[in-house]
Regions:
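Cysteine-centered catalytic environments shared across enzyme families
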Residues: 1-265
Length: 265
């Protein structure tokens, strides 16, 4: 469990590195092993690290590509990163660490935001593309890792936890009355709402892109619907005629999923 945070402002207002440090400290228990910040207006990124993959200083975040045009803060674990890493190396990419974080950076160089479709894991990340002056926020398919953001039409502030967003004095703490109504009706606040106006949860299987002029949120994955789609997912497209075949395939999928999750340093 790590913590990520950051801010994007295109109106010329500077980004305070001290603010990023305060935001990181607000969830330091999420990442007690290391802390880092990156500031290059109009963007600032912060990270608190819990070391799981590659415990060396090479795993320090925020992390960049070779020429510093792409910067990433990442929380989570990518279970198929080793296969992706080998493919990237064969395509000529030079990777300096053994982290899944660096793998995402180079995969983004190849695929753009479509790289999300190749990631098997639990994650939330923020990626700054300095070439296009765009900030991307991404979240895993099932929303295992949290990611919240504040947008008031001028600035974007994001973090793993809402209390880190509230560390920014520019962020309004106004109550969202629609969210309050939902809470009184349902006894909880469903995503993407939060109790604070203009603070939202990034939905599972979604990404946000922020650029000069505004933000947009898109869905890159959703739960398959329909019997045929579910069976294709379970069988890999092969016909299964007996209940025994389904059991064997399901067992193989579960066994493979558990094996992938045993990767750590």
């Amino acid at each position: 469990m790590c913590g990520i945070c950051g801010k994007l402002v295109f109106d010329g207002q500077g980004i305070s590195e001290n603010l990023l440090e305060v935001m990181c400290k607000s969830f330091s228990y999420r990442g007690p092993d290391d802390e880092g910040t990156f500031v290059s207006p109009p963007v600032g990124l912060g990270h608190s690290r819990l070391s799981i993959i590659d415990l060396s200083p090479a795993g320090h975040q925020p992390m960049s590509n070779e020429d510093g045009t792409i910067w990433l803060v990442f929380n989570g674990e990518i279970y198929d990163f080793q296969e992706i890493r080998e493919r990237l190396k064969s395509d000529g990419h030079t990777l300096k660490s053994l982290t899944d974080t660096e793998t995402i950076i180079h995969l983004f160089e190849e695929e753009g935001i479509d790289c999300l479709k190749q990631l098997n894991g639990m994650f939330a990340f923020a990626l700054w593309d300095g070439r296009q002056q765009k900030l991307w926020l991404g979240r895993d398919r099932l929303g295992i890792k949290p990611l919240n953001y504040y947008w008031d039409g001028r600035q974007l502030v994001f973090a793993s936890e809402i209390k880190a967003i509230l560390c920014d004095p520019d962020v309004s703490r106004e109550i969202d009355h629609e969210a309050l109504d939902l809470y009184l009706t349902l006894n909880y606040i469903p995503a993407p709402w939060t109790i604070f106006k203009n603070i939202r949860k990034l939905m599972p299987g979604s990404y946000l892109v922020a650029k000069k002029g505004g933000i947009s949120v898109e869905t890159y994955w959703d739960i398959p619907v329909g019997t045929e789609q579910r069976e294709n997912r379970l069988t890999g497209g092969a016909p299964l005629e007996e209940t025994r075949d389904f059991k064997q395939r399901l067992y193989a999928l579960l066994e493979g999923a558990v094996e992938r999750r045993l990767i750590s340093d």
